[in-house]
């Protein structure tokens, strides 16, 4: 038996497109020999959907898409994250799709309400474990925050689970993956259950989800790792209830990890909002040079335009460096002098500045003048 992890870059609110991505992933998983595929948390609507979760029609659309998805993937078993509404209550849910229908549904038990999370605003707490039989292996379900505490995993174990499937939308920060490994190893130690951990990938507003999904066996050893910061599919074979060794990856350096997170965040922010590209200011300094490199790696040079806005305080070296940076990365480049704006500023404040010696006040006003044409 093979279990597949679908690490997919979803778009919040684009339910039809997300469902199509899941169908395509299920087809690939089937071709790879998998009979079960696990998605990430709230995969059908994308995470975090925020106040879309306050709309009744949103749940109705998700429910219809879930039924359509079940029919489209008949012959595979899928565990899909989605929002669910029942008797006026809302839940962060995961449903088992089997034989073209919804077979079982689990409701998330632990709702994070700190930092970037505010799930208590939207959802009710689930109370019961969910365990189902797949080809002789009893699989329990947890959703993200559930595994950061002990009770949900222990409840699944008590209900007969022999393996834990965990759907996640766990955002990136530096060294986050190591923290995840430590948390999951603690759940493994407490329950003796291997874990299949599927994480969302992609940028959504200020958040970046790094993916880096994995499988850990009952000893706490990694059996499979998926790449970070990109969509991916991974399959692990199970023999007599034990996951077999799959591909492991070399860890990213801290610098590479941060750079890839920034690049992915920029790319998805631009693309998911439908922007044609990026306009950015080049100063000739290292900060804007790095920003330019991230933009080009995210979108390609054809979607980036760089603007140098020199004033009388700008050194010739800065202008030369800015132009060289733009040429090296093959982006469109223009110079837009802001001295006329500075002169207008000086004229407006001439009476207030009368009798005062020119100092850093005037020079530092350059940043304000540069903002005007950018807007």
Predicted regions and their residues:
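Enzyme catalytic cores with a strong preference for nitrogen-chemistry domains
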Residues: 1-281, 292-303, 308, 333
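Nucleotide-activated chemistry modules centered on ATP-dependent adenylation/adenylyltransferase
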Residues: 164-165, 171, 342-355, 364, ...
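A conserved beta-strand->alpha-helix junction
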Residues: 228-237, 303-308, 314-361
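Short, contiguous acidic/charged loop-to-helix segments that flank catalytic cores in large enzymes
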Residues: 253-254, 313-314, 361-365
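Generic hydrophobic alpha-helical scaffold/packing signal
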Residues: 259, 263-267, 283, 292, ...
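A glycine-rich phosphate-binding loop feature that marks nucleotide/adenosyl-phosphate handling sites
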Residues: 276-288, 341-342
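Short glycine/serine/threonine-rich phosphate/pyrophosphate-binding segments
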Residues: 288-291, 315-317
């Amino acid at each position: 038996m093979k279990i597949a992890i679908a690490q997919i870059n979803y778009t919040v609110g684009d339910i039809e497109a997300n469902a199509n991505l899941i169908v395509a992933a299920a087809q690939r998983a089937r071709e790879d020999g998998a009979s079960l595929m696990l998605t990430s948390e709230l995969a059908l609507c994308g995470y975090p959907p925020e106040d879309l979760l306050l709309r009744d029609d949103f749940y109705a659309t998700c429910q219809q898409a879930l039924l359509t998805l079940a029919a489209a993937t008949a012959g595979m078993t899928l565990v899909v994250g989605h929002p669910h509404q029942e008797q006026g209550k809302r839940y962060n849910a995961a449903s088992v799709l089997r034989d073209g229908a919804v077979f079982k549904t689990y409701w998330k038990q632990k709702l994070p309400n700190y930092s970037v999370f505010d799930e208590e605003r939207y959802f009710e707490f689930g109370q019961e474990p969910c365990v189902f039989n797949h080809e002789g292996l009893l699989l329990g379900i947890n959703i993200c925050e559930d595994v950061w505490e002990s009770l949900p995993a222990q409840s699944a174990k008590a209900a007969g689970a022999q393996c834990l499937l965990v759907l996640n939308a766990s955002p990136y920060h530096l060294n986050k993956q190591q923290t995840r490994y430590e948390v999951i190893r603690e759940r493994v130690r407490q329950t003796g259950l291997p874990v299949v951990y599927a994480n969302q990938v992609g940028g959504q507003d200020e958040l970046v989800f790094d993916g880096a999904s994995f499988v850990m066996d009952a000893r706490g050893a990694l059996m499979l790792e998926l790449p970070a910061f990109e969509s991916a599919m991974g399959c692990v074979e199970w023999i007599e209830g034990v996951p077999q060794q799959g591909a492991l990856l070399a860890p990213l350096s801290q610098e590479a990890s941060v750079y890839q997170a920034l690049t992915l965040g920029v790319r998805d922010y631009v693309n998911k909002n439908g922007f044609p590209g990026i306009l950015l200011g080049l100063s000739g300094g290292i900060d804007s040079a790095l920003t330019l490199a991230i933009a080009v790696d995210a979108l390609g040079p054809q979607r980036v335009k760089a603007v140098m806005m020199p004033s009388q305080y700008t050194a010739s070296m800065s202008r030369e460096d800015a132009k060289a940076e733009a040429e090296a990365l093959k982006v469109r480049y223009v110079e837009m002098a802001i001295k006329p704006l500075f002169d207008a500023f000086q004229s407006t404040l001439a009476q207030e500045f009368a009798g005062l010696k020119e100092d850093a006040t005037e020079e530092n006003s350059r940043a304000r003048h540069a903002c005007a044409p950018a807007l």
